[in-house]
Amino acid sequence: MSFTAVPLTLYPDMFPGPLGHSMAGRALESGTWNCAPVQIRDFATDRHRTVDDTPAGGGAGMVLKADVLAGAIDHAMKAHPGLPVLAMTPRGTPITQARVRELAAGPGAIILCGRFEGFDERIFDARPIEQVSMGDIILSGGEMAALLLLDACIRLLPGVMGAASSGDDESFENGLLEYPHYTRPVTWEGRTIPEVLRSGDHAKIAAWRKQQAEEATRLRRPDLWERHIDARARPASGARRKEED
């Protein structure tokens, strides 16, 4: 069964976009995944096909209408039963690699792409929608965020990356940033590949990579480092309690 991506968007021509190239493109051609974008505007009910209105209480910008969004969501859920519904919004929960793996292991996702000032909040009360953020940044629309999320999922689908272990040592997979990589030439602009990587000693290489990953995480992502330290401490604490019992 292929992974089904269902973007709900005002700009369906943006899909598959860059996902029609490289690994994701080959996977699309082979049927590993498929893309079925839905035009939100098709569910407007007036002759002008209006999808947005001014914000209640005043303020800048326009807000996507709950009734129109509900029509698009209901259509997608009926056409693709069992798919989770996600909304791309900076107000959402930051996505994690663990959540990406969960999505990639499932049948696909319906992804609601925002525009303007965002969504009428009532849509989240009325429909089962997971609000997701790709980071502390603001984009002009949810389509680019949806493409990022889909790329993260598609590369994890069976056969897409070739070797099944290709994604195992990447950043975030073990709670750390990934270790640095090098390739030929051995010396470039006076900078030489670390000797340990040329030693052929796999145990030393593994230890060096672990140390480099930990150091990069500690310096660049103290939030991840703190969680990593906490995760290492919890099993040890549990073992001590078991011994005491």
Curated annotation (Swiss-Prot):
Its EC number is 2.1.1.228. It is found in: Cytoplasm. It comes from the Bacteria. Transmembrane segments: none annotated. GO terms for cellular component: cytosol. One of its GO terms (molecular function) is tRNA (guanine(37)-N1)-methyltransferase activity. It holds the Pfam family tRNA_m1G_MT. HAMAP family: TrmD. Specifically methylates guanosine-37 in various tRNAs. Belongs to the RNA methyltransferase TrmD family. Homodimer. This is tRNA (guanine-N(1)-)-methyltransferase. It comes from Sphingopyxis alaskensis (strain DSM 13593 / LMG 18877 / RB2256). The gene is trmD.
